[in-house]
């Protein structure tokens, strides 16, 4: 029998993305030496992030250095939009971290901790599916491969030449730094900066999305439970007070879910708006770069990255769709229940719930775009059209 998931299981991956950067949202007690170690690593990653982000931005501003090379423009554009997405996510996360912490504590209080209640809530149904976890593992694996590939390739080329060939000093990112990275010590420093910067933007990008999926799935779980409870009730005029008390508890819990969903939109609204814009730009840049580069190692790497980024946004969109579906299912469950067997008072009160549940709960990008599978389809359609136009242009 499959193990029933605890609340800690739900937030484990999201929390781990930031803990591996040295940032602990929950401030878990630890020895002073370990605290200094992880805090120092977080400072290193943050400094590397802002330093290299400034270099990327400077390179984009210095347009003359990219002019005449579509490949360079798209590669720098790809790097810039991925960097921009991570910066916006990080800033949004840090600004709203206390509110996210409060939201997490509230959801933990509501989470069913007894095994019997966990079965009623069907907690495992709302945990990250096996396919979703595989998407996340593949995404992270692709990022690790792209981070280590330049160093491994440089070493292999040097070793094949038996030390006679020049060391190529390949780096993760093509960004020019303020020091010479083609000397041994400079290369080591540049690679440390590249690696910590790469880990920072990947973990922040993935970690914030995981947090959004975690809290939205918790709300979806409670909505699903309310719908099941509503469908199981058998009201009658003889048990009017008991039935109305039960219905009142469902209405109150639904109102609580509405408030929590507003908190989710407050914390992740700007993040999702930036995520949607930068993801579309990323996919278009990767599509173009793959066409230009053709079938080589770098082209394959960017094809893998394209699939990973698209899959990541699909997973986010599917959680938004799940919340929409389960929130509307509550009104459907109320309508399909045996409400007509209840008292007149019960019938009036269930109308309140039906009216309240008519409007679906949605994860929206600042109220502009609703995150759903339809949004994912629109995004992929735009990317494909861009890809088709670029391919025809290149072939000419």
From Swiss-Prot:
<keyword id="KW-0675">Receptor</keyword>
<feature type="topological domain" description="Cytoplasmic">
    <location>
        <begin position="1"/>
        <end position="6"/>
    </location>
</feature>
<dbReference type="GO" id="GO:0170020">
    <property type="term" value="F:ionotropic olfactory receptor activity"/>
</dbReference>
<comment type="subunit">
    <text>Interacts with Orco. Complexes exist early in the endomembrane system in olfactory sensory neurons (OSNs), coupling these complexes to the conserved ciliary trafficking pathway.</text>
</comment>
<dbReference type="GO" id="GO:0016020">
    <property type="term" value="C:membrane"/>
</dbReference>
<keyword id="KW-0812">Transmembrane</keyword>
<feature type="transmembrane region" description="Helical; Name=3">
    <location>
        <begin position="71"/>
        <end position="91"/>
    </location>
</feature>
<feature type="transmembrane region" description="Helical; Name=5">
    <location>
        <begin position="210"/>
        <end position="230"/>
    </location>
</feature>
<keyword id="KW-0472">Membrane</keyword>
<dbReference type="GO" id="GO:0004984">
    <property type="term" value="F:olfactory receptor activity"/>
</dbReference>
<dbReference type="GO" id="GO:0007165">
    <property type="term" value="P:signal transduction"/>
</dbReference>
<dbReference type="GO" id="GO:0005549">
    <property type="term" value="F:odorant binding"/>
</dbReference>
<keyword id="KW-0716">Sensory transduction</keyword>
<keyword id="KW-0807">Transducer</keyword>
<feature type="transmembrane region" description="Helical; Name=6">
    <location>
        <begin position="267"/>
        <end position="287"/>
    </location>
</feature>
<feature type="topological domain" description="Extracellular">
    <location>
        <begin position="92"/>
        <end position="141"/>
    </location>
</feature>
<comment type="similarity">
    <text>Belongs to the insect chemoreceptor superfamily. Heteromeric odorant receptor channel (TC 1.A.69) family. Or49a subfamily.</text>
</comment>
<keyword id="KW-1003">Cell membrane</keyword>
<protein>
    <recommendedName>
        <fullName>Odorant receptor 49a</fullName>
    </recommendedName>
</protein>
<feature type="topological domain" description="Extracellular">
    <location>
        <begin position="318"/>
        <end position="396"/>
    </location>
</feature>
<dbReference type="GO" id="GO:0042048">
    <property type="term" value="P:olfactory behavior"/>
</dbReference>
<feature type="topological domain" description="Extracellular">
    <location>
        <begin position="28"/>
        <end position="34"/>
    </location>
</feature>
<dbReference type="GO" id="GO:0007608">
    <property type="term" value="P:sensory perception of smell"/>
</dbReference>
<dbReference type="GO" id="GO:0050911">
    <property type="term" value="P:detection of chemical stimulus involved in sensory perception of smell"/>
</dbReference>
<feature type="topological domain" description="Cytoplasmic">
    <location>
        <begin position="56"/>
        <end position="70"/>
    </location>
</feature>
<feature type="transmembrane region" description="Helical; Name=1">
    <location>
        <begin position="7"/>
        <end position="27"/>
    </location>
</feature>
<feature type="topological domain" description="Cytoplasmic">
    <location>
        <begin position="163"/>
        <end position="209"/>
    </location>
</feature>
<feature type="transmembrane region" description="Helical; Name=4">
    <location>
        <begin position="142"/>
        <end position="162"/>
    </location>
</feature>
<keyword id="KW-0552">Olfaction</keyword>
<feature type="topological domain" description="Extracellular">
    <location>
        <begin position="231"/>
        <end position="266"/>
    </location>
</feature>
<dbReference type="GO" id="GO:0032590">
    <property type="term" value="C:dendrite membrane"/>
</dbReference>
<dbReference type="InterPro" id="IPR004117">
    <property type="entry name" value="7tm6_olfct_rcpt"/>
</dbReference>
<comment type="function">
    <text>Odorant receptor which mediates acceptance or avoidance behavior, depending on its substrates. The odorant receptor repertoire encodes a large collection of odor stimuli that vary widely in identity, intensity, and duration. May form a complex with Orco to form odorant-sensing units, providing sensitive and prolonged odorant signaling and calcium permeability. Involved in the behavioral responses to butanol and 2-heptanone.</text>
</comment>
<dbReference type="Pfam" id="PF02949">
    <property type="entry name" value="7tm_6"/>
</dbReference>
<feature type="transmembrane region" description="Helical; Name=7">
    <location>
        <begin position="297"/>
        <end position="317"/>
    </location>
</feature>
<dbReference type="GO" id="GO:0005886">
    <property type="term" value="C:plasma membrane"/>
</dbReference>
<dbReference type="GO" id="GO:0034703">
    <property type="term" value="C:cation channel complex"/>
</dbReference>
<feature type="transmembrane region" description="Helical; Name=2">
    <location>
        <begin position="35"/>
        <end position="55"/>
    </location>
</feature>
<keyword id="KW-1133">Transmembrane helix</keyword>
<feature type="topological domain" description="Cytoplasmic">
    <location>
        <begin position="288"/>
        <end position="296"/>
    </location>
</feature>
């Amino acid at each position: 029998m499959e193990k029933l998931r605890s609340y800690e299981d739900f937030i484990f991956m999201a929390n781990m993305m930031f803990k591996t950067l040295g940032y602990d949202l929950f401030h878990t007690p630890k020895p002073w030496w370990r605290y200094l170690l992880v805090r120092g690593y977080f400072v290193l990653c943050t400094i590397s992030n802002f330093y290299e982000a400034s270099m990327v931005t400077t390179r984009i501003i210095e347009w003359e250095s990219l002019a005449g090379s579509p490949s360079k423009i798209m590669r720098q554009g790809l790097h810039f939009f991925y960097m921009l997405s991570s910066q916006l996510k990080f800033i949004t996360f840090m600004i709203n971290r206390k509110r996210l912490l409060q939201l997490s504590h509230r959801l933990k209080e509501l989470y069913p901790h007894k095994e019997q209640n966990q079965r009623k809530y069907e907690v495992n149904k709302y945990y990250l599916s096996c396919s979703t976890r595989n998407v996340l593992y593949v995404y992270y694996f692709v990022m690790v491969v792209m981070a280590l590939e330049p160093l491994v390739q440089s070493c292999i080329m040097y070793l094949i030449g038996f030390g006679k060939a020049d060391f190529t000093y390949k780096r993760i990112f093509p960004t020019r730094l303020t020091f010479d990275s083609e000397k041994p010590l400079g290369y080591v420093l540049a690679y440390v900066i590249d690696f910590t910067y790469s880990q920072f933007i990947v973990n922040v990008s993935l970690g914030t999305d995981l947090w959004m999926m975690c809290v939205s799935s918790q709300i979806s779980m409670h909505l699903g439970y309310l719908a099941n409870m509503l469908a199981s009730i058998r009201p009658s005029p003889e048990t009017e007070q008991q039935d109305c008390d039960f219905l009142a508890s469902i209405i109150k819990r639904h109102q609580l879910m509405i408030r929590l969903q507003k908190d989710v939109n407050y914390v992740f609204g700007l993040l999702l708006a930036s995520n949607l814009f930068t993801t579309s730009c990323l996919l278009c840049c990767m599509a173009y770069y793959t066409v230009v580069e053709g079938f080589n190692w770098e082209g394959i790497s960017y094809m893998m990255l394209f699939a990973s980024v698209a899959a990541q946004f699909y997973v986010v969109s599917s959680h938004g769709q799940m919340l929409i579906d389960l929130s509307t299912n509550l009104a459907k469950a109320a309508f399909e229940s045996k409400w007509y067997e209840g008292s007149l008072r019960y019938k009036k009160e269930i109308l309140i719930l039906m009216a309240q549940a008519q409007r679906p709960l949605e994860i929206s990008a600042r109220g502009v775009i609703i995150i759903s599978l339809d949004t994912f389809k629109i995004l992929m359609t735009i990317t494909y059209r861009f890809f088709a136009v670029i391919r025809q242009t290149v072939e000419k």
